[in-house]
């Protein structure tokens, strides 16, 4: 009788443990079911980065005084400042400035400590390339302004996803019935179809 009761007790404990594990698993599953989808049909849809996003560095050649503060504060001594000393004026003359974004960790120290504010962080994050050497930007490439997603006709910027609604701290509190993050390819095509027709069949007004 004692052995039988021990077996029953062991069976009850195992059943209780299995039920607990099932409950924990279904809790995670149903929690994910309540979340909003996060799919974005890139590159037809792009998220607008947050206000303090640390993207590609923008550089203004005319403001730079070749002080090399950016090199000293960089954790990996990345910026390359090429300058010569003008013996007549006894001042530095900047010749070239470059940053290799294949090595950069985007910490923002160079931007923070620049005395002339010639460096700034942009929201540009599309730096993919087939050759890593193309990620070494010189002063000309660094001086180009980043492309604006909101003015690109081939891209639908998701403005409503840049920030959470006012007063909402947890993204799980946003109901699933709100605006979807991503759209299906056919929905993207339907949205772009009128614009594609305008490109294929442009309207030409006769000369008066």
From Swiss-Prot:
Per its UniProt record, the required cofactor names are: [4Fe-4S] cluster
The free-text cofactor remark is: Binds 2 [4Fe-4S] clusters per subunit.
Location, primary (coarse class)? membrane
Q: Tell me the compartments it is located in.
A: Cellular thylakoid membrane
Q: What class of enzyme is it?
A: translocase
- Binding-site positions, [4Fe-4S] cluster 2: 74, 104, 107, 110
User: What keyword terms does UniProt attach to this protein?
Assistant: 4Fe-4S, Iron, Iron-sulfur, Membrane, Metal-binding, NAD, NADP, Plastoquinone, Quinone, Repeat, Thylakoid, Translocase
Give the residues the record marks as binding [4Fe-4S] cluster 1.
64, 67, 70, 114
Q: Which domain of life is it from?
A: Bacteria
Annotated membrane-spanning segments are: none
Annotated membrane topology is: Peripheral membrane protein
Mention any one GO cellular component term assigned to this protein in its UniProt record. Answer: plasma membrane-derived thylakoid membrane
Outline the subunit composition: NDH-1 is composed of at least 11 different subunits.
What protein name applies here? NAD(P)H-quinone oxidoreductase subunit I
Source organism of this protein record: Prochlorococcus marinus subsp. pastoris (strain CCMP1986 / NIES-2087 / MED4)
